[in-house]
Amino acid sequence: MERKYQNEIHCNEIVLLAYYIADVNIESVFHDITHRKTYLPYSGICLTDTFQLAEKKHNELFTEFFQDNSKRVKKQMATHVRVIVGNPPYSIGQKSANDNAQNLSYPYLDKRVSETYAVKSSATLNKSLYDSYVKAFRWASDRIPQNEGGIVAFISNGAWIDGAGQDGMRRCFEDEFTSIYVLNLRGNQRTSGELSRKEGGKIFGSGSRTPITITFLVKNPAKKGQKAVIHYHDIGDYLTREQKLKMVKDFRSISSQKLEWQIITSNDKADWINQRDGCLLYTSDAADDRISVD
């Protein structure tokens, strides 16, 4: 545990307050688990923009003033990372430049989204693919070793699971990974009436209106070339936030017997849930069928 704590656990934060909170939390968990009598500081946290590290011409943050931080960033970039865990922000539609997740420019990462998720999408409007949480999935998918495999585990905006504009994203997940686990926590409050009540409590409280998913993307090099097996679990209807969180806590693991995974086979439109059957065809000719009243 001490070896992993000191050498194998890395953390990035760009907001100073969040940086210190994350540092304290990691140190607290380590000391609670190990029951050490002497304090051992955590040295794996970096004050940096994770997405900026993917850019070919990235700038080392505050190199002159924070040399230790710069060394940590260099060490992390040289490290083989096989498991990435996070809660990425989402930023499309932010109301002002003062919002927490500002829409910064990441040319290389945007290019990667364009040549993967956007290329494989049949949607004509791809704005939603440039949301920060989508970029996080793209960055993490590229960051894990392509030949050795790894795991990406995110709790994120869940709009991608059935969004028409994210069909290319779902196609890429199937092509790039071998196993996919999606726990749909629902909570979509961009709805109204009975549908809103069915969606249940908002996972992140009053500040959240989007649906939330916990997603595990597994890349197993032994199964290279095979389409991913998609495991899906819907948390259920009419549940409060507290009920949902208790259920997640009780699950403990994706191998839990309490989790009844449904195996999904996507259709040719890359629908995973709420699949279209393709039987209905609507044309403008329907407007010609009129009933005349004399």
Positions of PLM-derived features:
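E2/UBC-UEV (E2-variant) core
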Residues: 110-124, 239-272
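SAM-dependent methyltransferase catalytic region
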Residues: 1-182
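Flexible, glycine-/basic-rich loop-and-beta segments that form/coincide
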Residues: 202-251
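A short acidic, often aromatic-flanked loop/helix-cap motif at beta-alpha or helix-coil junctions
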Residues: 51-55, 188-192, 238-242, 269-271
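Substrate-binding/catalytic lobe of Class I Rossmann-like enzymes that use SAM or dcSAM, i.e.
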Residues: 154-158, 196-199, 213, 219
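Single conserved hydrophobic/aromatic residue that forms the stacking wall/gate
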Residues: 282-294
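Class I S-adenosyl-L-methionine
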Residues: 181-214
